[in-house]
């Protein structure tokens, strides 16, 4: 089936789909305090979703393109779930968040199909994949339109990979007790087996959101990247997130001995946000298999155990947490009790001595991840490194931090 036909088949005009902000029915929804963080963006008044400009621009989206799509959403006079929130237009039509971002992605997909130059076509496919992922953001369970956008994002990503430098392999890994999971192995030029980074992404991202990390930071250092969707989303959607948050990644890590392109004696894990919960767990449970673990803005204890910190987090992020935990109808109190069990300190891991080298980067006054969180990680390691990342200029400092982190990983793998 062609890309155009797939888009038409998936996105037939319908108005019965539950709108994204209505999927999680939590009680005691409060007012939204202003909040901004480098990795998550900020909660802008009159928007349900956090507007994550840094990460979208880092993934290659032009700031003007973001504003253009936002303007189309704002200008819509279609029915909304909440008249006060622009991005809650009901149904797949003009003004709906998923519709507008998917429409933008389809324009790039069409350009990719018409482009004769393979490299340029690959770039356009990659851009289309990124925009489809933004359409599906924040990837709540049961969001049918978002799941269709994710399917198109994955297809576009596969098309891009065929045309861009290096090589990409789509791999299936068996996980006992449930469905297999699909991972993408990105390999730089040269002969393998390669030292490899196992990417553990945030809860509001897809595994295809990290190509920039591979292309700009890992591939130039001769390091491969293996990506995997977090439980309950994407290719891991049949798995619920549990207190054993690293279950899927752990089985994949063990299976790397059978992957000929990966040097299983030189593997590191890199965790963004809640992905750090997975990565640090692996540092304790699979120390012999990991040479190093790096974290960025980790969510391993404070946000999971401190009700006051949870009360400052935007509604969308609490909805993401509730969705991942399968608690679509939970009160905030029930959600807090459950989240506490995901703290690696409560689980008795963090605070114990860990032989795996661990690095953690943090921003001062990060509402999701205080400095103490990163200090707890690095002080628990027999070889810890702490990095403070200045907030402004946000993009340049983010790039500089990633260069420093990947240098540290390279030093331990190569």
UniProtKB/Swiss-Prot annotation:
Role: Catalyzes the hydrolysis of esters.
Assigned EC number: 3.1.1.1
Organism: Salmonella arizonae (strain ATCC BAA-731 / CDC346-86 / RSK2980)
Keywords in alphabetical order: Hydrolase, Serine esterase
Catalytic reaction list: a carboxylic ester + H2O = an alcohol + a carboxylate + H(+)
Encoding gene, per UniProt annotation: frsA
Gene Ontology molecular function: any one: carboxylesterase activity
HAMAP family: FrsA
Enzyme superclass (EC): hydrolase
Keyword Transcription: no
Disulfide bonds: none
Protein's UniProt name: Esterase FrsA
């Amino acid at each position: 089936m062609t890309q155009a036909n797939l888009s038409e088949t998936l996105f037939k005009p319908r108005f019965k789909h539950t709108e994204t902000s209505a999927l999680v029915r939590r009680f005691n929804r409060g007012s939204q305090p202003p909040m901004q963080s480098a990795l998550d963006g900020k909660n802008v008044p009159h928007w349900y979703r956090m507007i994550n400009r840094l990460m979208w621009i880092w993934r290659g989206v032009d700031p003007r393109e973001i504003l253009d799509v936002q303007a189309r959403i704002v200008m819509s006079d279609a029915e909304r779930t909440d008249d006060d929130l622009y991005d809650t237009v009901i149904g797949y039509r003009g003004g709906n968040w998923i519709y507008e971002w998917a429409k933008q992605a389809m324009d790039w997909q069409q350009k990719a199909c018409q482009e004769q130059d393979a490299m340029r076509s690959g770039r356009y496919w990659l851009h289309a994949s990124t925009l489809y992922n933004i359409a599906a953001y924040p990837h709540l369970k049961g969001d049918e339109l978002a799941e269709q956008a994710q399917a198109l994002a994955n297809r576009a990503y596969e098309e891009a990979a065929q045309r861009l430098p290096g090589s990409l392999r789509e791999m299936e890994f068996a996980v006992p007790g449930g469905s297999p999971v699909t991972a993408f192995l990105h390999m730089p030029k040269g002969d393998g087996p390669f030292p490899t980074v196992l990417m553990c992404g945030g809860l509001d991202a897809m595994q295809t959101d990290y190509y920039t990390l591979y292309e700009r930071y890992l591939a130039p250092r001769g390091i491969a990247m293996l990506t995997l969707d977090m439980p309950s989303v994407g290719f891991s959607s049949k798995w619920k997130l549990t207190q054993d948050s690293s279950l899927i990644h752990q089985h994949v890590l063990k299976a790397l001995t059978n992957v000929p392109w990966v040097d299983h004696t030189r593997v590191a894990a890199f965790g963004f946000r809640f992905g750090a919960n997975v990565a640090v767990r692996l540092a304790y449970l699979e120390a012999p298999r990991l040479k190093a673990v790096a974290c960025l803005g980790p969510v391993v204890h404070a946000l999971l155990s401190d009700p006051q910190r949870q009360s400052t987090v935007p509604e969308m992020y609490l909805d993401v947490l509730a969705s991942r935990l399968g608690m679509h109808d939970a009160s905030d109190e029930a959600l807090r009790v459950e989240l506490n069990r995901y703290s690696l300190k409560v689980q008795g891991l963090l605070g114990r001595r860990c032989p795996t080298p661990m690095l953690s980067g943090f921003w001062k006054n990060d509402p999701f991840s205080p400095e103490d969180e990163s200090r707890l990680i690095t002080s628990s390691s027999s070889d810890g490194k702490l990095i403070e990342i200045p907030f402004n200029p946000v993009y340049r400092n983010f790039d500089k931090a990633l260069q420093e982190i990947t240098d540290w990983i390279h030093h331990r793998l190569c």
